[in-house]
Every structure is written in structure tokens, then in C-alpha cells.
Amino acid sequence: MLAGRVRMGQSWNGAGAAGAAGGLVRPAQRALAVPHVSARDPRGVDWRALRAAGARACVFDKDNTLTDPYALELRPEVAGAFAECLEAFGARNVALVSNSAGLAEYDPEGKEADRVERELGCPVLRHALKKPEIEPEALTRHFGCATEEMVMVGDRFLTDVMYGNRMGMLTVKVEAFTGSGERATVRAARWAETRLVGFWMGSLGTQPPAHAFFSHPAAEHSFLKKS
């Protein structure tokens, strides 16, 4: 029942659509959709370098970032990278913020969040607003640090990346694992936003917001593992 409600609700994200519309006319809004770091998946990210540069906490999206859509198991190929992140930051300083598990609209009693926590061994933040709408107080209360000291990792430009950039996080964009299990409207939205943000970045030269972590020597390789 919950999965059905989540799939239906995720077919429309008003805040994400508003972000896209704003980007058409406002350069500053476009910048919020551009990630600081892009990687195929979490395996490409240098978690120790991020920690050395001053990052104190890491926030992950769940679906198509760590798991298949609506699944509870880590994708096998990223399990090692997730363990590296937990080791670099400490398990208490890593959490999931999802538009499914933990979101009051679809998971008011937190039962799905509890299941995810048991399966993934990682806290799931309970929150009231769907990304990219922000609740910085929930994050600072959970982690005990400023949002500017956090990293946001996700697969969507107009939800995960915009959510993180709105709060001054360093944002990491990864590629989705699969469209299988997602509603057709979600796949269409991903296709559209990828091309829209790609146009902003390529043709308009839109850059992400400046971030202090890039002034640290640990940013030598832009927080990507050396190949």
C-alpha cells in the first residue's frame, strides 16, 4: 500500500517543476540545479578527501542512488563504497533523506523508514517536505553541524541537487541505476530534467554555487577517486 502511494505521489513534484520554471528566467535558480561533483555512482567519490576538506556529514537519497527504486537492499556494486563513506564520516554522521521512506505524506508512522534503517544500517531522516523543499533545522538537529558542512548525494538534478544547493551543501550527482519499477512519468521527468540542466550547463555555461571545500588541498581531484 505504501509503495503504491509513493509511486503515485512521486509522479508529480511541484517544487521540482517550480525550480525548472524558475531556471528558465533566473540564472541563480539554474545554478542550484548544477552539481559540484558528478560520478557514475558512489564508487567514484573520494569520501576521505571530502572529510579532509571539512565535510562533517553526508546525506544520501535512497532510490536509484543506493538501491533500486523502492527496494530495501543496497545495490551490490555500491555496497563497498557506502561502507567507505560510513568509515570516513562515522555511521552517526551519514543519513538518508528520501521522498519515500520517512516522508510524512507517505510514511506518517515511519514504518517504512524503520524497515530501511534495519536493512541498510543507516538512519532515515523523518521529514515533512518533499525534496527540493528544504528543512535545514531537521538536518542540523540530527547531525549537530551547519548544512554548509554537509554533502548531498543523489540521482536527480531538480530534487536532490537542488535540495542540497539550496542549503549550501556540496552536491554529488550520480547516475540512476535503472528505470525499472518507476512510473513512466518519473522516467519522463528524469529525461526532461537531464536535458534541461544539460543545456544550462553546456550551452549557457551555468556553474554550481561556489563552495568552500574546493579551496582545500584535498579537492585536488575534485573529490573523485583517481582512475
Description of each model-found segment:
Residues L2-R56, A71-L72, V78-M152, R156-S227:
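Asp-based, Mg2+/Mn2+-dependent phosphohydrolase catalytic module
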Residues D61:
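Active-site residues of response regulator receiver
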Residues T65-L66:
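Hydrophobic "anchor" residues
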